[in-house]
């Protein structure tokens, strides 16, 4: 005999409604949210008044590099101090010898770590250059397909070495987009490329040719970084790409004069520019709250995990929210609530999935049950993820993947 519901989550605290509800699910959709749902059901979860959240969004990762520092008593690569050039050089050495199977294994390990922590959506930037070729892209796309019932992965064909530094990058990016990458990305058009106009124009040319969005790394600080982001926003408008471009990192906002940002915010809003800051590297003076209050779309992300760029990381966005609040010295309930939005609804907007995201009737049943009373306490307590639901199916229970 058929049941009215495939799954009901009972006594779920929904922070957006500030009350406790039942959530009724059929297939992969939420079909009812009421104080008490009646009807027959195949499976039930009692949240016991604890917080139920939409799945977390990790809006900027590098899954093809993950776990490359592991396997020895001390983390590989980390006998030397960090510099950008050293990390790029170590990456080139790695990709020269890495196998398809090794990269794919690391991607799957990364994804499983994310899923255990309740992350159900991620965007990963995959190196494409004359050394890596499309080796990493092939491995990531294959893993993405195998992981589709656990996590949604967007893949950026990323010119890590620079379009104008590594002249094979353009043709290899084209090949990667032909293979099915979802976005195109570049890096530091000023200090890496030494050609702001040329690199941005090439990125838009590729994006428009393949009808994909753009996600651009801009680490540059000060006036150089602000200029690069402003030109990216201006070109977004000129190319008819409003709402389709993301700037990742944007460290320059942390040291730019406040009046510069005040002048630029209308441009960013007009262009629909999206931003991502990564909790492992967010500068302490990053004006996160100011940007959010101004209506700028700002997500949060883990960035690299245990590789030649960063020796640490575990793909846990709730831990990331705690790190972010501590780096920025945020303490109020309101501010912690805003940080929570960065790993949920703001991240969903960055990925362009907001129409199907959230706890509302008709939206996808991608949910996390936490051992916590609220988002604020979840961050403070580092709450356990009691249950993770993807497409209406329980995929994690008691911190074990069961799907």
From Swiss-Prot:
Residue ranges that the Swiss-Prot or TrEMBL entry lists as coiled coil: none
One Pfam entry name: Amidohydro_3
Swiss-Prot/TrEMBL GO biological process terms: atrazine catabolic process
Localization per Swiss-Prot or TrEMBL: Cytoplasm
Protein transport keyword on record: no
Annotated GO MF terms: hydrolase activity, acting on carbon-nitrogen (but not peptide) bonds, in cyclic amidines; metal ion binding; N-isopropylammelide isopropylaminohydrolase activity
Cofactor(s) in the UniProt record: Zn(2+)
Keyword Mitochondrion: no
Outcome (variant: residue 188 to A): 5-fold increase in kcat with ammelide as substrate
CDD domains: Bact_CD
GO cellular component: cytoplasm
Note accompanying the cofactor annotation: Binds 1 Zn(2+) ion per subunit.
Tree of life domain: Bacteria
EC number assigned by the record: 3.5.4.42
Pathway annotation from the record: Xenobiotic degradation; atrazine degradation; cyanurate from atrazine: step 3/3
Active site: 249
pH effect on activity, per entry: Optimum pH is 7.25.
Effect on the protein upon substituting residue 160 to A/E: Almost no effect
First-listed, main subcellular location of the protein, grouped into a coarse class: cytoplasm
Purpose of the protein: Transforms N-isopropylammelide to cyanuric acid and isopropylamine.
Subunit record text: Homotetramer.
Family assignment from sequence similarity: Belongs to the metallo-dependent hydrolases superfamily. N-acyl-D-amino-acid deacylase family.
Protein name as catalogued: N-isopropylammelide isopropyl amidohydrolase
Taxonomic source organism: Pseudomonas sp. (strain ADP)
């Amino acid at each position: 005999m058929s049941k009215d519901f495939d799954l009901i989550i009972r006594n779920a605290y929904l922070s957006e409604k500030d009350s406790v509800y039942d959530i009724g699910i059929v297939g992969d959709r939420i079909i009812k949210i009421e104080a008490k749902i009646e009807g027959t059901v195949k499976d039930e979860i009692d949240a016991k008044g604890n917080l139920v959240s939409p799945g977390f969004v990790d809006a900027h990762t590098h899954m093809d590099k993950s776990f490359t520092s592991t396997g020895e008593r001390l983390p590989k690569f980390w006998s030397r101090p960090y510099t950008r050039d050293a990390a790029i050089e170590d990456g080139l050495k790695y990709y020269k010898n890495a196998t398809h199977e090794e990269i794919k294994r690391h991607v799957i390990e990364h994804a499983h770590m994310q899923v255990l922590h309740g992350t159900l959506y991620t965007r990963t930037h995959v190196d494409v250059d004359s050394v890596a070729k499309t080796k990493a892209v092939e491995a990531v796309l294959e893993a993405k397909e195998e992981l589709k019932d656990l996590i949604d992965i967007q893949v950026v064909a990323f010119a890590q070495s620079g379009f104008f530094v590594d002249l094979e990058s353009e043709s290899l990016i084209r090949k990667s987009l032909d293979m099915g990458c979802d976005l195109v990305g570049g890096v530091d058009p000023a200090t890496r490329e030494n050609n702001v106009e040329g690199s941005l124009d090439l990125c838009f040319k590729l994006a428009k040719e393949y009808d994909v969005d753009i996600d651009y790394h801009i680490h540059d600080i000060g006036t150089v970084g602000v200029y690069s982001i402003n030109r990216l926003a201006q070109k977004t408008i000129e190319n008819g790409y409003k709402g389709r471009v993301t700037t990742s990192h944007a460290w320059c906002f942390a040291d730019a004069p406040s009046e510069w940002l005040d002048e630029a915010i209308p441009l960013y809003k007009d262009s629909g520019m999206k931003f991502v800051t990564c909790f492992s590297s967010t500068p302490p003076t990053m004006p996160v709250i100011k940007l959010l209050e101004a209506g700028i779309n700002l997500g949060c992300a883990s960035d690299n995990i245990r590789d030649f760029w960063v020796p640490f990381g575990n793909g846990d966005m709730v831990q990331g929210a705690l790190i972010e609040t501590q780096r920025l010295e945020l303490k109020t309930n309101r501010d912690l609530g805003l940080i929570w939005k960065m790993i949920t609804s703001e991240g969903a907007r960055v990925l362009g999935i907001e129409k199907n995201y959230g706890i509302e009737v008709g939206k996808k049943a991608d949910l996390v049950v936490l051992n916590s009373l609220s988002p604020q306490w979840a961050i403070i307590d580092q709450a356990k993820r009691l249950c993770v639901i993807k497409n209406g199916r329980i995929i994690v229970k008691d911190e074990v993947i069961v799907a």
